[in-house]
């Protein structure tokens, strides 16, 4: 009985064992095979997601079914021109380019496979090669590609199989370039050597069946000679037959098809990224929407709401559009209403493809057509946002400009990569600090956080001076440079790129914020080169704020941008073989740590949040003027003060420190003049502080500043100055309490009797040239400083009597106190010429400085040399040369 009761349980156990054994033999291998296929098919779309991959995204997408083609539409296969020629220098012998962009490294050679691609590599069953085309092999002659045509532009990112998971299918985009026999060696060759190499697919050039020019070797191009087609213009038949060729030979091999001109430039990486976000199984017709010129409106046979894609920037067709449209090309050729091939292609797509060119406004930016005034057939201005945002650029009819544009695009990419290296150095330095490990020397040099305070000067001659600039002019105190000059092309280009990157950072999240900010102009700015770190900018930008969410608003705003272009690691390429051992021995080991300094590409980075300048800083400026005698000069100063401050009602206060001798008679006129202005402007703040004894500028300024609180903004001024309103604003902007003191470099006039040849001086004092004056870069008397910073630095040395030296002493104290002196040319102030009288009783050091200042005010070195030659040699020179 016990044995019989166990029989059902033994049967169940035996059945389970047999069932699991059969499942492992029959079912498990099939499941593993299906999982492997699914993994291969989905890995190609992992970057953009399954929804953007079209019919290859998964099994739920039905495969497109080929349509039957009318017999009369079948044309004989076009003749293929095997144009033999030297291989392109960029191509490696026997290796197909696997790069989807020029900066992606190709996979190892062993990852390539012979024959057709395996099923799952593209998401579709492996398609056989086109009729008459041999399968691609690994080995081959230099420049050989598929179909045996030399120089064929069949590019891609990988072919599946053993490729890396990030590899993408090669057969993604087919580009047909329309050209003519006369342009094969110029425009077509330029396109092949520039953008065509970076298309994620194949690029072929379509021309007529005419024989090439006799006596000239054909260029190394993949040329398709269309039968029965010539190079006449307009190329309507050529365009339709090229589209038919794409359909007949590559419909099931590529997802997207593009018709392009030979004078267009295409950014392959941006185009691939854009197209992978769309579904090629849907009928899509992409390009810049066109309606015709103003003269042609109503004459193109377009109904209201109909359009076409302009042929210049390029037309892009999805696979489904070609599947629907091409069987009816014969009917489209017989029923044309205009001579414009792009209009007729658009009409055919709309009629038989079931779609038309997209109406999206953004297409005008992505497919860029150059509408510059007085177009010359090439894109001249490269430093603007339109060039950077575009995918295709048209036209560049001259090959030299095509190479120029390509070189600029490569340089932009190099700059982005170098900036990325700087970011990585910063991250590495930060992680070393967080992990309490030693920071490498390279990270110490290149991973520093941007700042204006990397270099702390210890003496006044170590202070790096700033150059003042406007949108068109540069004011510099550098040796052997004119004080006022136009912006050089190099500096203008650098400013354009700088502003362009600033605007990209400002508008990075413009769509989500519902606003857009446009650049108008540079109001003014400062620039200097820190040889240890990079170029530094302070720019006052005039912008337009446009709000497009909610209540629409457009207002002008100003921003104060603090920027730095950092030096990155230099890269060298030796054109000759060098003896490394002898080279190492000849290099000083002490200079190796500074090898990162070079005149290399600089990358813009924002290291301080842009300070919005919606309204001016209206801090009250307290103008302190020490004075003794010189009533006529004081009268001129007060007239200028009235025009610049009293009439415009500037937020200023004038303090006159009036020194007088024992008699006091020489100060009575000054007091009456001040009282007259006080009566005329009762609300104006003007104060006169009388002082007895010998003149001491430092003592007078120290006594006057002692009457104000610590938050007072002080301007130490001289009676010989003529200034404008903008100088007062820059005094406010460039002085930062506790951080920065503004030391403007003043333009000083020469003796007008010498510069004008005895003629009376002009009324316009603000004329900057080598003939009229010079930048007083050795003067530190004019200062904008807060009272608290003056006290922190130690104040003036009141023991200094007479002329000079007190300003140099205060400047040294400012540096030693840790404050940052801001030095730049100030175009809003001019030091008017006056005869200098040096007292022999002065301190020897002061007396020597006074004589040097007196000698520098006569005239320029060139003018003095001319005067001497005229007097002693009787030779007349042209004074305008200076």
From Swiss-Prot:
Lumenal side: 29-882
Function: Has both beta-1,3-glucuronic acid and beta-1,4-N-acetylgalactosamine transferase activity. Transfers glucuronic acid (GlcUA) from UDP-GlcUA and N-acetylgalactosamine (GalNAc) from UDP-GalNAc to the non-reducing end of the elongating chondroitin polymer. Specific activity is much reduced compared to CHSY1.
Enzyme Commission identifier(s): 2.4.1.175, 2.4.1.226
Subcellular location: Golgi apparatus, Golgi stack membrane
Pfam entry (one): CHGN
Tissue specificity as recorded in UniProt: Detected at low levels in brain, cerebral cortex, uterus and small intestine.
Compositional bias segments (type: Low complexity): 59-69, 120-131
Membrane topology: Single-pass type II membrane protein
PANTHER family assigned to the protein according to its UniProt record, in alphabetical order: CHONDROITIN SULFATE SYNTHASE 3, CHONDROITIN SYNTHASE
Reactions the enzyme catalyzes: 3-O-(beta-D-GlcA-(1->3)-beta-D-GalNAc-(1->4)-beta-D-GlcA-(1->3)-beta-D-Gal-(1->3)-beta-D-Gal-(1->4)-beta-D-Xyl)-L-seryl-[protein] + UDP-N-acetyl-alpha-D-galactosamine = 3-O-(beta-D-GalNAc-(1->4)-beta-D-GlcA-(1->3)-beta-D-GalNAc-(1->4)-beta-D-GlcA-(1->3)-beta-D-Gal-(1->3)-beta-D-Gal-(1->4)-beta-D-Xyl)-L-seryl-[protein] + UDP + H(+); 3-O-{beta-D-GlcA-(1->3)-[beta-D-GalNAc-(1->4)-beta-D-GlcA-(1->3)](n)-beta-D-GalNAc-(1->4)-beta-D-GlcA-(1->3)-beta-D-Gal-(1->3)-beta-D-Gal-(1->4)-beta-D-Xyl}-L-seryl-[protein] + UDP-N-acetyl-alpha-D-galactosamine = 3-O-{[beta-D-GalNAc-(1->4)-beta-D-GlcA-(1->3)](n+1)-beta-D-GalNAc-(1->4)-beta-D-GlcA-(1->3)-beta-D-Gal-(1->3)-beta-D-Gal-(1->4)-beta-D-Xyl}-L-seryl-[protein] + UDP + H(+); 3-O-(beta-D-GalNAc-(1->4)-beta-D-GlcA-(1->3)-beta-D-Gal-(1->3)-beta-D-Gal-(1->4)-beta-D-Xyl)-L-seryl-[protein] + UDP-alpha-D-glucuronate = 3-O-(beta-D-GlcA-(1->3)-beta-D-GalNAc-(1->4)-beta-D-GlcA-(1->3)-beta-D-Gal-(1->3)-beta-D-Gal-(1->4)-beta-D-Xyl)-L-seryl-[protein] + UDP + H(+); 3-O-{[beta-D-GalNAc-(1->4)-beta-D-GlcA-(1->3)](n)-beta-D-GalNAc-(1->4)-beta-D-GlcA-(1->3)-beta-D-Gal-(1->3)-beta-D-Gal-(1->4)-beta-D-Xyl}-L-seryl-[protein] + UDP-alpha-D-glucuronate = 3-O-{beta-D-GlcA-(1->3)-[beta-D-GalNAc-(1->4)-beta-D-GlcA-(1->3)](n)-beta-D-GalNAc-(1->4)-beta-D-GlcA-(1->3)-beta-D-Gal-(1->3)-beta-D-Gal-(1->4)-beta-D-Xyl}-L-seryl-[protein] + UDP + H(+)
Ranges for region Disordered: 46-167
Keyword Disulfide bond: no
Cofactor(s) it depends on: Co(2+); Mn(2+); Cd(2+)
Protein name (Swiss-Prot/TrEMBL): Chondroitin sulfate synthase 3
């Amino acid at each position: 009985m016990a044995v019989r009761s166990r029989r059902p349980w033994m049967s169940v156990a035996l059945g389970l064992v047999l069932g699991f054994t059969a499942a492992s033999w029959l079912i498990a291998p099939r499941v593993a095979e299906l999982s492997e296929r699914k993994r291969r098919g989905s890995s190609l779309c992992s970057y953009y997601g399954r929804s953007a991959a079209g019919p290859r995204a998964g099994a739920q997408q039905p495969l497109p079914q080929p349509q039957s083609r009318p017999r009369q539409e079948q044309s004989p296969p076009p003749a293929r021109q095997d144009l033999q020629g030297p291989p392109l220098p960029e191509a490696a012998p026997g290796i197909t380019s696997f790069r989807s962009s020029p900066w992606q490294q190709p996979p190892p050679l062993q990852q390539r496979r012979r024959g057709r691609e395996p099923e799952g590599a593209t998401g579709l069953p492996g398609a056989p090669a086109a009729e008459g085309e041999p399968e691609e092999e690994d080995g081959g002659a230099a420049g050989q590609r598929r179909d045996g045509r030399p120089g064929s532009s069949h590019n891609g990112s990988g072919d599946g199989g053993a490729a890396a998971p990030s590899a993408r299918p090669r057969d993604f985009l087919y580009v047909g370039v329309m050209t003519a026999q006369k342009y094969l060696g110029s425009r077509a060759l330029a396109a092949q050597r520039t953008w065509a190499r970076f298309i994620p697919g194949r690029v072929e050039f379509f021309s007529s069946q005419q024989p090439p020019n006799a006596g000239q070797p054909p260029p190394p191009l993949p040329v398709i000679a269309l039968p029965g087609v010539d190079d006449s213009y307009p190329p309507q038949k050529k365009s339709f037959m090229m589209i038919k060729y794409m359909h007949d030979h590559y419909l099931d091999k590529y997802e997207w098809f593009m018709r392009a001109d030979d004078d267009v430039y295409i950014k392959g990486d941006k185009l691939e990224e854009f197209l992978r976000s769309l579904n090629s199984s849907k009928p899509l017709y992409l390009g810049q929407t066109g309606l015709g010129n103003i003269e042609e409106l109503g004459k193109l046979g377009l109904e209201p709401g109909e359009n076409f894609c302009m042929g210049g920037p390029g037309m892009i067709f999805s696979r489904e559009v070609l599947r629907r449209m091409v069987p009816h090309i014969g009917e489209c050729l017989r029923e044309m209403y205009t001579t414009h091939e792009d209009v007729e292609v658009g009409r055919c797509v709309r009629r038989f493809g079931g779609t038309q060119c997209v109406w999206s406004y953004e297409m005008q930016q992505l497919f860029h057509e150059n509408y510059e005034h007085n177009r010359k057939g090439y894109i001249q201005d490269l430093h603007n946002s339109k060039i950077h945002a575009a995918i295709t650029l048209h036209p560049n009819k001259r090959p030299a400009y095509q190479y120029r544009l390509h070189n600029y695009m490569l340089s932009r990419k190099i700059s982005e990569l170098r900036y990325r290296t700087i970011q990585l150095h910063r991250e590495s330095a930060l992680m070393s600090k967080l992990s309490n490990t030693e920071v490498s020397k390279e990270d110490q040099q290149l991973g520093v956080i941007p700042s204006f305070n990397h270099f702390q000067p210890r003496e006044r001659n170590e202070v790096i001076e700033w150059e003042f600039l406007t949108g068109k002019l540069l004011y510099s105190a550098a040796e052997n440079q004119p004080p006022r000059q136009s912006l050089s092309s190099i500096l203008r280009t650098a400013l354009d790129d700088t502003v362009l990157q600033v605007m990209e950072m400002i508008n990075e999240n413009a769509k989500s914020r519902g606003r857009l900010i446009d650049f108008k102009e540079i109001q003014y700015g400062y620039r200097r080169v820190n040889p240890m770190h990079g170029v530094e900018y302070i720019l006052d930008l005039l912008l337009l704020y446009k709000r497009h969410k909610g209540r629409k608003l457009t207002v002008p705003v100003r921003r104060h941008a603090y920027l730095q272009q950092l030096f990155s690691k230099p890269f060298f390429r030796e054109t000759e073989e060098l003896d490394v051992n002898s080279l190492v021995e000849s290099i000083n080991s002490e200079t190796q740590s500074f090898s990162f300094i070079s005149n290399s590409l600089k990358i813009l980075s924002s290291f301080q949040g842009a300070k919005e300048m919606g309204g001016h800083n209206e801090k009250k400026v307290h103008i302190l003027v020490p004075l003794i005698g010189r009533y006529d000069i004081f009268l001129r100063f007060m007239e200028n003060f009235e025009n610049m401050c009293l009439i415009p009602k500037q937020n200023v206060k004038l303090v006159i420190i009036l020194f007088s001798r024992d008699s006091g008679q020489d100060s009575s006129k000054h007091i009456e003049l001040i009282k007259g202005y006080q009566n005329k402007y009762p609300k104006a703040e003007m104060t006169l502080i009388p002082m007895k004894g010998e003149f001491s500028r430092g003592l007078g300024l120290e006594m006057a500043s002692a009457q104000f609180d610590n938050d007072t903004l002080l301007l130490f001024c001289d009676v010989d100055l003529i200034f404008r309103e903008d100088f007062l604003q820059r005094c406010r902007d460039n002085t930062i309490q506790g951080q920065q003191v503004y030391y403007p470099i003043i333009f000083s006039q020469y003796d007008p009797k010498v510069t004008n040849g005895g003629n009376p001086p002009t009324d316009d004092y603000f004329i900057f040239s080598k003939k009229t004056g010079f930048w007083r870069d050795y003067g530190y008397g004019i200062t904008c400083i807060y009272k608290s910073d003056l006290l922190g630095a130690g104040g003036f040395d009141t023991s200094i009597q007479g002329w000079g030296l007190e300003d140099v002493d205060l400047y040294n104290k400012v540096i030693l106190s840790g404050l940052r002196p801001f030095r730049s040319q100030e175009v809003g102030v001019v030091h008017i010429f006056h005869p200098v009288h040096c007292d022999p009783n002065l301190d020897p050091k002061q007396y020597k400085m006074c004589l040097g200042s007196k000698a520098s005010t006569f005239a320029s070195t060139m003018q003095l040399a001319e005067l001497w030659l005229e007097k002693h040699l009787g030779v007349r020179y042209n004074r305008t040369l200076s």
